[in-house]
């Protein structure tokens, strides 16, 4: 099926050009205006071939991207702490990350970086005691008023929070950047680690420079009840042209 000399493949490439991310439904609507008989199967098959050729990349359920490099967090900043917790509590379900892992995306580099540990609420005190005994500056699930008054940011600062169960366990390891960005938004509200504009700039810098799983991020944001602000920033990316 063609439009003039252009194939469906050509039109998808043209549609994707200049976009960091796009939705399947958005693409289909654009093409259906010119090809009333275009089926979802034909469109999906063409997208599959473009992905296989490396021109377009998967960005989660119903989302695509023109960014080849997938977002990954450097594990080094939390490796020592992670190993300490694993040695002491080998059967504990937990995860951790640090703002240091996002250092390449800050517009203004913070004076101190903060690490976060998430685990079962009944286990947090034991983890806090362990980290405190190893010279970490720890805070156990501080609420907004407490956090803004009493948290002292310095080297090896760790905030411990209850682990939010998200979908299946097997989906967790691959979603660390997406989760960290959503969790950081919540921390801007609770701890005032950075203001809204700095957060927005960091978010934009990250998702323009490497590819995220947009669908997974939106699912997690919905689970954490912050889907609107996260979606708004993603839509801002969609409204700007990629180089």
Which residue stretches match the model-derived regions?
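Short beta-edge/loop segments at beta->alpha junctions of small alpha/beta modules
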Residues: 2, 15-91
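Hydrophobic alpha-helical interaction segments
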Residues: 139-243
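Short, Lys/Arg-enriched, disordered terminal segments
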Residues: 1-7, 242-243
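Short, charged/polar micro-motifs that form catalytic or ligand-binding hotspots
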Residues: 17, 36, 117, 167, ...
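Short, well-structured alpha-helical interface segments that form or flank functional binding sites
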Residues: 22, 42-45, 122, 126, ...
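Short gly/ser-rich loop at a beta-strand->alpha-helix junction or flexible surface loop bordering the NTP-binding
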Residues: 62, 78-154
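Short, leucine-enriched amphipathic alpha-helices that occur as contiguous helical runs
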Residues: 4-13, 178
């Amino acid at each position: 099926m063609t439009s003039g000399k252009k194939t469906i493949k050509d039109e998808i490439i043209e549609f994707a050009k200049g976009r960091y991310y796009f939705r399947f439904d958005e693409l289909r609507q654009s093409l259906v205006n010119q090809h009333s008989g275009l089926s979802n199967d034909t469109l999906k098959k063409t997208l599959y071939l473009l992905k296989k050729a490396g021109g377009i990349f998967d960005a989660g359920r119903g989302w695509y991207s023109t960014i080849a490099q997938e977002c990954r967090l450097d594990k080094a900043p939390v490796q020592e702490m992670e190993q300490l917790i694993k040695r002491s509590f080998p059967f504990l379900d937990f995860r951790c990350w640090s703002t240091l892992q996002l250092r390449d995306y800050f517009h203004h580099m913070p004076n101190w970086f903060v690490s976060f540990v998430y685990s079962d609420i009944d286990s947090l005190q034991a983890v806090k005691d362990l980290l405190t005994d190893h010279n970490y500056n720890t805070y156990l699930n501080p609420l907004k008023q407490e956090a803004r008054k009493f948290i002292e940011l310095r080297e090896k600062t760790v905030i411990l929070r209850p682990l939010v169960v998200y979908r299946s366990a097997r989906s967790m390891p691959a979603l660390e950047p997406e989760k960290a960005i959503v969790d950081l938004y919540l921390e801007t509200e609770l701890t005032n680690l950075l203001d809204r504009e700095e957060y927005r700039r960091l978010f934009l810098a990250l998702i323009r420079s490497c590819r995220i799983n947009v669908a997974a991020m939106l699912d997690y944001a919905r689970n954490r009840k912050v889907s609107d602000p996260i979606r708004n920033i993603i839509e801002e990316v969609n409204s700007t042209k990629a180089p």
